[in-house]
Amino acid sequence: SAGGGSSYIGNSDLSNKAMYCYNCATSNAANTKTISVTCHSDTATSNCAKEGAGYAKISYVKASTEDQEISNPSPAKFDYTGSVQEYTVIKTGKYKLQVWGAQGGSDSPSDGGVGGYSEGKIELTKGSKLYIAVGGQGSPYTRKAKSNGGFNGGGYGGIVNASSNPQ
């Protein structure tokens, strides 16, 4: 099976944020954290890999040492739509950005690899625009037709010979 569609939230200010890696052996990056191999869910759960389509969430947080999410303004939540979505910052302050990648396509009896998780906190100014691309799950492999990868870079299901089927 292959990887799912990537999810991301982006603007020019995003760099050096915490990255999570599902089932990674090691990493040299100072901010890389590992997601537990046993922690994956079909719902968006912090620090867990995601089954199915991807997801994204933007939350305003307090400027205190706790960085707790607060309810005003309400968190913006983004499900998979198959296209890039836009968010306009409604209040200047610190925001927590969370994204979950989509699951890859499957090839019976194996399920596609689950999507990863990433988060970061960033200061944003009212009126700034963020662009959100939530990954789509890769389609299952069938013997009759080649499957398609998910939206935003997702992998297709099935095992193929790369030299005879370049992507």
Task: Report the location of each language-model feature.
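Acidic glycine-/aspartate-rich tracts in secreted/extracellular proteins
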Residues: L14, V61-T65, G101-G105, G135-Y141
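Histidine- and aromatic-enriched segments that form or immediately flank copper-ligand environments
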Residues: G101-E119
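GGW-centered surface loops in extracellular recognition modules
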Residues: K57, E66-S106
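Residues that flank catalytic or metal-binding motifs in active/ligand-binding sites
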Residues: G3-G4, G52-G54, S83, G93, ...
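Secretome/extracellular-domain signature
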Residues: V114-Q167
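Extracellular beta-strand-rich recognition modules
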Residues: I35, S41, A56-I58, Y95-V99, ...
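C-terminal, surface-exposed recognition/capping segments
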Residues: A2-G54
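Short, structured beta-strand segments at or near domain termini in extracellular proteins/domains
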Residues: K50-S64
